[in-house]
Amino acid sequence: MLGSSVLRLFSESTDNAVTGSVQSKNSIRLLPEKIRNFVIAGIDVKEADLLTKLLDQVQPDIVINCVGLVKQLSDVNDPLVALPINSLFPHRLAQMCASVNARLIHISTDCVFTGKKGMYSEDDVTDAQDLYGVSKRLGEVDYPNAITLRTSIIGHELEGHRSLISWFLNQKGAVKGFKQAIFSGLPTIEIARIIRDYVIPNPDLTGVYHVSSEPINKYDLLCLVADIYQKDIKIIEDHQYKIDRSLDSTKFRNATGFKP
């Protein structure tokens, strides 16, 4: 979901020589036709030799890692599947990037926090109890050539209906909207723009940074989405479910000048 948005945005400019990678050739057919030629298929990130060969071939200045098992997949509960992808791979990739003098931009998640407090800063202790949150925390990179962006995203999947937007637009009749569930994420295309306009121009940024918008509850968010997409559906206020994983991105805003 994020990878296709990043590829689409960066390929719009002739100033960028862009290369994307996917594991399956079938994934390419899901991409907009105009960006398919930028993509190399058959890259399994668990195969170190393939990645090394790809990096040697492309010689990138910047690598944006959009690979990860998402919370909605059942495999994320299997440590033998989740840990190699979410935890180990980012660190291996950072080392590979260093070998070709490339900077790694890695994407993490607000799910490293339980959501009991809200407005988490980078100084707050990560307290996720589930394997997904723990695996993503272990995968956060902090090297001289790497930056980790903690955020939350919404957007359209290339296929399936697991993401919030895709799920909501596929519903009929009525859905619940959680008034006590707080979200501070951003659309995938906006994350891509932030990387282009604020992260890449600041090569000295390393370590973990929170990237967020102003917090909104999930009920209001769904109402906003329904209005934008002219979705005729009843959204029922639910006050029972309570979680607040909103992120305080003051550090990132001060360092880059970003304003949501």
What are these regions (language model features)?
Residues 3-4:
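N-terminal Rossmann-fold NAD(P) dinucleotide-binding loop
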Residues 20-29, 44-45, 68:
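N-terminal Rossmann-fold cofactor-binding loop
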Residues 42-85:
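NAD(P)H-binding glycine-rich loop region in Rossmannoid oxidoreductase-like domains
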Residues 80, 84, 88-92, 111-149, ...:
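Catalytic helix-loop patch of NAD(P)-dependent Rossmann-fold dehydrogenases
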Residues 129, 141-190, 197:
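NAD(P)-dependent short-chain dehydrogenase/reductase
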